[in-house]
Amino acid sequence: MKTLRSTLLLLLFVPLIKPAPPAPQESPLTFDYAADHLEEAIFSQDYEDKYLDGKNIEEKQTMVRSVKRSLELQKDESVTPAPPKKENDEMPTCLLCVCLSGSVYCEEVDIDAVPPLPKESAYLYARFNKIKKLTAKDFADMPNLRRLDFTGNLIEDIEDGTFSKLALLEELSLAENQLLKLPVLPPKLTLFNAKYNKIKSRGIKANTFKKLNNLSFLYLDHNALESVPPNLPESLRVIHLQFNNITSITDDTFCKANDTRYIRDRIEEIRLEGNPIALGKHPNSFICLKRLPIGTYF
């Protein structure tokens, strides 16, 4: 009975009981990293822009000052007169030739005369052109020449004294031209080449080679010589006389007939092939030589 009464009272008061409102909870503290980073980036960019703007302005100002200074210098230079040129500074224009470090190359350019060249020239190569004559004026102002090469031209005449002022000339090539005679040669020649011309024995004077004490190489092959040139210097090492019209050789041509002990030891090569002569008929002509000439002996 008591239990039933308690149950009824509980049912009567339950509707009157209201649940208490939930206690307000504080929201947890959050950190918006993106927003904060964005603000920092904006600040940094703004600062950097201002810094760079200032730097660019400074650079532009510096550049303007440099340009002004350059213009002032140019103005001063234009007012200042240039020093007069010296005569030694002026050099002839090589025109069709190529001038390089004392060497002048005028090969296969169809010139018919020796062009004006720098005074300092030491080597002139004028091969395979149309030059017909050489004169003393061609080399009057070129005292330093050491080598001249006129191979393959049309040279018929060489004026007297053409090479007289070329005291330093060591090598001279007149090969493959139309020469009938030889000019007076400079004293210091070591090489002379006049092969493939039309030179006859009467076109070579008796003393042409006598005083050339430095001459080592002599090329006179493929000409019209009837005899070996006289008075060949002791300095000769190579003598080319092949394919001429040489018909006779004497005991004095290369040796000394009156001196059987004489030996010509410097000569290394003598070529006489292609001549109408039997070398075997002249045994005493080569007795002073270490090597017999190249040619037909029988």
UniProtKB/Swiss-Prot annotation:
Cystine residue pairs: 255-288
Tissue distribution: Highly expressed in cardiac right ventricle, cardiac left ventricle, uterus and lung (at protein level). Detected at low levels in skeletal muscle, uterus, small intestine and liver (at protein level). Detected in blood vessels of kidney, pancreas, spleen and brain (at protein level). Detected in aorta and skeletal muscle.
Database matches in PROSITE patterns: LRR
Glycosylated position list: 88, 214, 258
InterPro entries, sorted: Leu-rich_rpt, Leu-rich_rpt_typical-subtyp, LRR_dom_sf, Mimecan/Epiphycan/Opticin
TM stretches of this protein: none
LRR repeats: 112-131, 132-155, 156-179, 180-199, 200-225, 226-246, 247-277
Signal peptide: 1-19
Keyword set, alphabetical order: Disulfide bond, Extracellular matrix, Glycoprotein, Growth factor, Leucine-rich repeat, Proteoglycan, Repeat, Secreted, Signal
Location of the protein in the cell: Secreted, Extracellular space, Extracellular matrix
Annotated GO MF terms: growth factor activity
Gene Ontology cellular component annotations, sorted alphabetically: extracellular matrix; extracellular space
A GO BP entry: articular cartilage development
A family per Pfam: LRR_8
PTM per Swiss-Prot/TrEMBL: Contains keratan sulfate.
Functional description taken from the UniProt entry: Induces bone formation in conjunction with TGF-beta-1 or TGF-beta-2.
Family: Belongs to the small leucine-rich proteoglycan (SLRP) family. SLRP class III subfamily.
Entry protein name: Mimecan
Species assigned in the record: Oryctolagus cuniculus
